[in-house]
């Protein structure tokens, strides 16, 4: 029996919905990254983007264990001398709750050219509503 390799033309992506309210960030990010990569399918091929779309709602209510809310920081660098800035998770949760999940999922994707394309399949919303009702997403429990 020959090994099956998926083709880009034959992939039929689906849409999945994940509710982040009260779910630990790491568990949520692993689940989302595996769906985006296509690891949950029998037709998974590492060199082809076989993944599905993921919609994450309630990003502002994602759970962080321990003291990560006060201790963890996100570092940004402008490229200029003295252009480094750091922001705590609590501040990012107030201003951009989507960034926390996007950053975690991005870290769990492979570091190659396909990862940038895979990351476009992640849609994160801070509240309970989203704009992709027409795609009939399947609800996934984490």
UniProtKB/Swiss-Prot annotation:
Transmembrane segments: none
Domain of life: Bacteria
Stored Gene3D superfamilies: Ribosomal protein L13 (3.90.1180.10)
Protein's UniProt keywords contain rRNA-binding: no
Keyword set, alphabetical order: Ribonucleoprotein, Ribosomal protein
Family per similarity comment: Belongs to the universal ribosomal protein uL13 family.
Quaternary structure and partners: Part of the 50S ribosomal subunit.
Protein name: Large ribosomal subunit protein uL13
Gene transcribed to yield this protein: rplM
